[in-house]
């Protein structure tokens, strides 16, 4: 197609290929599902979209076709069956890219009914079809996504109804769910869309896990929506900024490789969505190397910045925590991740011990973190985790930093923050910190499986498997 330019095409295909592969690696699509779309940076009347029947996780150059906004072009014949939906999404001001994927937890929570409200909040009928809101109950999802419209469609694949409703939802929200079909997101770049998709899936996985563990997630979602995310989760989440990545204040290849390996592992394993969380290493008495993400797929840049340990005006919550850790303890490395299952397990344990008011009305239920023996913990039940650490420290999202530091001291560098994620600290290396956040997700998964077996099949309760520690 004239006007797109060879240079633009050379940039577009690798980015779409890497994005599609990243989604596939995190089980966001089957072999032939989903679609990606991106505005041409030169010819603004053109967008590029994956072809119908292409393998989004293994794209080849001919799988990406150009389509015009203004008129029918040769690309329309090969483009995804949902190309008209993407055409309208990309007409939204500021929308340079859009993605539709089939993430498992996001689709699973969309199977809800107004009589149940197990995962979603019922909003009413739209032309005879039910409409819901997916309200994330975790800090990252609440800040980044807010309310995610979730619609029921008579024809939920490539229909005129979808063409009319999805762009309308995305004009006000970065993401929307199609019942039984999956999320659509829009953003300023494919990188931002991947970031948003990951948060949708992580927040859905957390919501589902917490609900199945007995947490009244509906009450929690209503409370967050009523109070607003800033009041409920005062630790603001930094907005996605592509300019934050690609800067390296070290030339040491071993250091760069270590940070990249941790980011790739966390991404592929679902420990943290792309461009969430953070990592650092203390390198001198007064300085650290700081990476503003704990997660990135192959082909996507991270960043490593050399920063002073002293707090500076404008530091966000995570950066302040890294700096405080190095000033007040002898740890040398730290990783903070969104850890959806661990975060959900933290919510469940707090609800079991203190009641739902501890989550819905945290100001009315004070938690005591001062006693090194009697404070909130999550007890692993799998052999390896018990061997490593028979108790993992647990804090609510409003715990003072000093309490979190105590948990890391008392529990070998491991702490879960209910509604927020996981923190791992290493005495010497980043790998030690990585072990803790990786183990946190496994600990939660095993506990949740045993709980479901107990509830559904009469198996032994969690207490039967928990280590007898004080």
Tell me the role of every PLM-derived stretch:
Residues 1-470:
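Glycine-rich flexible loops
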């Amino acid at each position: 197609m004239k006007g797109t330019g060879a240079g633009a095409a050379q940039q577009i295909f690798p980015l779409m290929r890497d994005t599609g592969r990243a989604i596939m690696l995190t089980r966001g699509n089957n072999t032939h599902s989903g679609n990606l779309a991106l505005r041409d940076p030169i010819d603004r009347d053109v967008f590029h979209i994956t072809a119908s029947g292409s393998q989004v996780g293994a794209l080849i150059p001919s799988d990406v076709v150009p389509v015009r906004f203004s008129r029918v072009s040769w690309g329309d014949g090969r483009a995804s069956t949902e190309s008209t939906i993407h055409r309208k999404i990309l007409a939204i001001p500021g929308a340079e890219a859009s993605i539709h994927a089939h993430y498992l937890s996001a689709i699973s929570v969309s199977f809800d009914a107004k009589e149940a409200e197990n995962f979603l909040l019922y909003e009413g009928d739209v032309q005879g079809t039910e409409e819901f809101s997916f309200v994330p109950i975790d800090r990252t999802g609440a800040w980044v996504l807010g309310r995610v419209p979730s619609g029921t469609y008579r024809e939920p694949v490539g229909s005129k109804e979808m063409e009319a409703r999805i762009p309308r939802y995305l004009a006000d929200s970065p993401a929307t769910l199609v019942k039984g079909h999956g999320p659509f997101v829009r953003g300023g770049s494919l990188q931002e869309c991947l970031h948003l998709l990951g948060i949708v899936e992580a927040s859905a996985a957390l919501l589902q896990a917490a609900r199945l563990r007995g947490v009244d997630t509906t009450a929690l979602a209503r409370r967050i929506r009523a109070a607003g995310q800033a009041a409920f989760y005062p630790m603001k989440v930094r907005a996605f900024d592509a300019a934050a990545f690609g800067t390296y204040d070290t030339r040491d290849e071993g250091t760069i490789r270590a940070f990249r390996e941790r980011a790739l592992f966390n991404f592929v394993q679902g420990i943290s969505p792309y461009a969430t969380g953070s990592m650092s290493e203390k390198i001198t008495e007064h300085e650290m190397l700081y990476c503003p993400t704990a997660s990135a797929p192959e082909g996507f840049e991270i960043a490593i910045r050399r920063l002073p340990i002293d707090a500076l005006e404008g530091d966000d919550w995570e950066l302040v925590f890294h700096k405080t850790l190095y000033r007040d303890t002898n740890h040398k490395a730290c990783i903070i991740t969104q850890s959806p299952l661990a975060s959900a397990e933290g919510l469940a344990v707090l609800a079991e011990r203190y009641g739902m008011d501890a989550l819905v009305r945290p100001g009315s239920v004070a938690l005591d973190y001062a006693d090194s023996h009697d404070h909130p913990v999550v007890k692993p039940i799998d052999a390896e985790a018990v061997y490593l650490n028979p108790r993992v420290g647990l804090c609510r999202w409003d715990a003072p930093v000093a309490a979190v530091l105590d948990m890391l001291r008392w529990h070998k560098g491991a702490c879960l923050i209910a509604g927020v994620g996981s923190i791992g600290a290493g005495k010497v290396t980043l790998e030690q910190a990585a072990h803790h956040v990786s183990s946190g997700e496994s600990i939660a998964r095993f506990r949740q499986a045993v709980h479901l077996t107990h509830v559904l099949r009469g198996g032994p309760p969690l207490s039967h498997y928990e280590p007898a520690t004080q």
